[in-house]
Regions:
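Active-site beta3 strand of CheY-like receiver
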Residues: 46-51, 56
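Hydrophobic residue at a beta-alpha junction
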Residues: 32-33, 56-59, 86
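Charged docking surfaces used in two-component/phosphorelay signaling
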Residues: 16-24
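Short, Lys/Arg-enriched segments at the junction into DNA-binding effector domains
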Residues: 4, 115-164, 168-177, 181
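Basic, amphipathic DNA-recognition helix from helix-turn-helix-like DNA-binding domains
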Residues: 60, 66, 70, 75-137
Length: 231
């Protein structure tokens, strides 16, 4: 079955261009030029991935991302005409999984869409060579890969697809340090550059907050300075 992609961008030429490229890849596309018109589609929940522009005429793209994250965990890719690092960090903080800066090459967006859907539907990190069980646990933390559920002391923890994937990689390698380069390659399936470190840092911070693990001596995700992270 074809995945359903939601596009919300008030720049009609960009939205139309993305629609053409996505349909050429056999995706089902729901395209809107403002957030208001897209609300019924969003509320239906029948979406596999959303592409949101930050600057919309009727709603801030960040606010829309936050609204979606209250109910849904499907991947969100933000489009921005700005290049400030703060925009990227803000989007990731509110639950976005990736961002693309305008102007962009349509094929780059398609590649990112495929990567996000691949990770969301079926995750298999590249740095893990042995078969990993469907359920992983450490102390009071439990991660079920098949149901995409995270439990902390028996209570559900809502994670974005990227947060789930990062935690999966680290938990699958419990006791060992996972370098930032390995983590980036495993989760994003892309080459690591030093500028990507802030992306990892933001997601790790969110994970710690959701796991109530923000003390100076974290119980779960530990930072090994200059190397990476471990559980």
């Amino acid at each position: 079955m074809s995945e359903k992609i939601l596009i919300i961008d008030d720049e009609q030429d960009i939205a139309d261009l993305l629609e053409v490229y996505l349909k050429n890849e056999n995706y089902i596309v729901y395209k809107f030029y403002c957030a208001t018109d897209a609300m019924s589609c969003i509320e239906s929940g029948d979406i596999d991935l959303a592409i949101l522009d930050i600057m919309l005429p009727d709603m801030n793209g960040f606010s829309l991302c936050q609204l979606i994250r209250k109910k849904y965990t499907y991947p969100i890719i933000m489009l921005t005409a700005k290049i400030e690092e703060t925009d990227k960090i803000t989007g990731l903080t509110l639950g976005a999984d990736d961002y693309v800066t305008k102007p962009f090459r349509p094929l780059e967006v398609i590649a990112r869409v495929k990567a996000q859907l691949r990770r969301y539907k079926k995750y298999s990190p590249s740095i893990i060579t042995e078969k990993v069980p469907s359920e992983l646990s450490y102390n009071k933390l439990c991660l079920n890969v098949q149901t995409h559920e995270c439990l902390l002391d028996g209570e559900p923890v809502s994670l974005t697809p990227t947060e789930f994937s990062i935690l999966h990689v680290i938990l699958s390698n419990a006791g060992n340090v996972v370098s930032i380069e390995e983590l980036f390659h495993a989760v994003w399936k892309d080459e690591y550059y030093s500028k990507n470190s802030s992306t990892i840092t933001v997601h790790i911070r969110h994970l710690r907050e959701k796991l109530n693990d923000t003390s100076d001596t974290p119980q779960y995700i530990k930072t090994i300075w200059g190397v990476g992270y471990k559980i």
